[in-house]
Amino acid sequence: MTFWWRDPAGTQKTSTIKRVWLYVTGVTDHHQNARPQSLERIPDTDVWQWQGEFSPEWRGSYCFIPSDNEDDFASAVFEGEQPDRMALREGWRKLLPHAVSDPLNAQSWRGGRGHAVSALEMPEAPVQPGWNHPDTPYKKPVCIEWHSARLKNRRRVWIFTTGDESPERPLAVLLDGQFWAESMPVWPALASLTHEGKLPPAVYVLIDVIDTAHRSRELPCNPDFWLAVQDELLPQVKSMAPFSDRADHTVVAGQSFGGLS
């Protein structure tokens, strides 16, 4: 697989860009403890490129991070047999806010951390049930504003239902709700899977993180957050869309900090 990026400022004679870091899910990202990879400029052109091998089944996202610096990462990242994990994470943490999506890739959005990403899948990537029917009709979700007395803040919450109204419907809580509501709307996928009988009719609650600071504070194992959800939010949701109180009929889904939650 070859990645290409064109420097808007032109060649090395007119541009200040020294690196174009490539952040690829599961390949060069901070979870892999892999040395950072930069595209290389083709001399005397505005073209940068990087080539790597990918599994035929791979699917994920990627982004470019142009930089005017040669040394965005500490030297410990490039020394020894393995990069220093903490130094690697710190380097990516500083760089990711400056990430850009691929301007030639129409399938681009803002990822869960708020930075731009683009989609990529190899020819043998497995089918994604539900997502392969984007035109499935669905009932429009309701967006409310939750004012939390315990957390002393307010945020958006989306309530989405499938099937007929019933107090026995399961409950699914999706963290990073703004991502699944706006960046990558999950509604048609859930509706499709429900229509096919692969998911039961359910009540879905998508909780906004407000911003990255609140996400970092509230999601990783924060009992106050969950007490607020349980005591404040869910009773409000239940008055609008009845659902079952049974633990075995309840799902909480999240990724990264949401997974820790």
Please state what every model-predicted region is:
Residues W58-P66, I159, R169, F225, ...:
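Short beta-strand segments enriched for Tyr within beta-sheet-rich domains
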Residues F243-S256:
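Alpha/beta-hydrolase fold nucleophile elbow
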